[in-house]
Amino acid sequence: MSFVYKAYEVDIRRSDPSEPPLTISNTEELVAGIKEYYNGLDREVILSCVMDDANRLLGIYEVAKGATGNVEFAFATALRPAVLMGATKVILVHNHPSGDIAPSDQDVQMAKGMFICASMLDMESLDSIIIAGSSYGSVHSHPEFQRWVENDLAAIAQAFTGDGYLTE
């Protein structure tokens, strides 16, 4: 008796491999390219946009679908395509069907966790973007995220030595 077991399977392909990957210069370009995806959705959906060092878009992957007011996911699920594609940068994008682009406390916590997890994999979490109708906003620009980067994250970074091991 034999069987095949797949731990996970991810189908990664480009529609036309002969075309060079799109280079993302700013948030507006990324939002313009994907906001149509969110039109008419009545629940929150998270996308992971993965890029290389030159900001070439390697792919956009659906991470999770949630309810009308929230969505849950595992950071490993969001980062798996980036790891498999050899990406060095990632941007999370999700929608707010309510039309309010203000980040919730959960949105800020998600952005913090993604920032740390991506860093541990030698990747850069460039932003976490919220799209609501024709508007969008950056969680990384939110005052609570900024305070965390300036204060708490600096303290975490000081706990690490140059060789990456925690010190006492």
What residues fall within each predicted segment?
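N-terminal beta-strand/alpha-helix entry module and adjacent surface
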Residues: 1-87, 106-124, 132-168
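Short beta-strands and strand-loop turn motifs
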Residues: 90-96
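Conserved beta-strand edge residues that scaffold enzyme active sites
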Residues: 96, 130-132
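Short, solvent-exposed loop/turn segments at secondary-structure junctions
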Residues: 98-102
